[in-house]
Amino acid sequence: MFTSVYPKFHNICPRIEVEPIERSVRDQHPLLLSGELDLGFMTLTRSQQKSGIIYETLASEEMVLAVPTKLVTALDMRNGDLALLREEPFVLTQKTSTIREIVDSIFKNAGFTPNVLFETSNNHAIISMIHENICCGILPMYYMDPEDEAITYFQLPDHPSWEIVAAYRKGHYISKPARTLIELAGNYFTQ
């Protein structure tokens, strides 16, 4: 998002210095609360939000089940029934990721514990492994590639999702340039 939004921001506010700091959501929260970080962009559920922080929702994003197309055919998996994948390997995001709480809940609701091949912080790695017919995965819709015929995507029951938000400390003054950056980020996700 940042690399797409920043050039537009720089054209509007050329004299404003932005210091991007890449941190996990869990690391951003204390930095926002302490004032070390003015503005954060993150993905989380409402239950993961912390008091003392304002969250402006930029977009909501649904999770999808991603399965190698060859496996979909072999299992005659027309409706994306997650239970059919009980014995299949999954690559999941690391337990410290905000998405992992959602993913664990999806498996709990499906009535089984997944066979975890490995965990990663990189969703592109999950997509690569699925593309190579090594595993299945649950990902944000952002990572769907309808052009990739090696992967079939399914919506999940209850349509689990998270929010993409701009976050800042309650009572913290949001400057006009910061507001511009938030608006540009919101536009990015609604295009």
Question: What would you call each of these model-derived segments?
Answer:
Residues 1, 152-191:
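A late-sequence structural motif
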Residues 10, 54-57, 73, 81-83, ...:
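Short secondary-structure boundary/capping segments
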Residues 29, 33, 55, 82, ...:
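Short hydrophobic/charged patches on amphipathic alpha-helices used for structural packing
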Residues 33-42, 63, 112, 130-137:
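Alpha-to-beta junction loops
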Residues 48-56, 60-61, 124-171:
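Beta-alpha-beta core module
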Residues 52-90:
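Flexible hinge/capping segments at coil-to-helix
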Residues 93-94, 114, 139-140:
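Thr-Gly-centered strand-to-loop micro-motif
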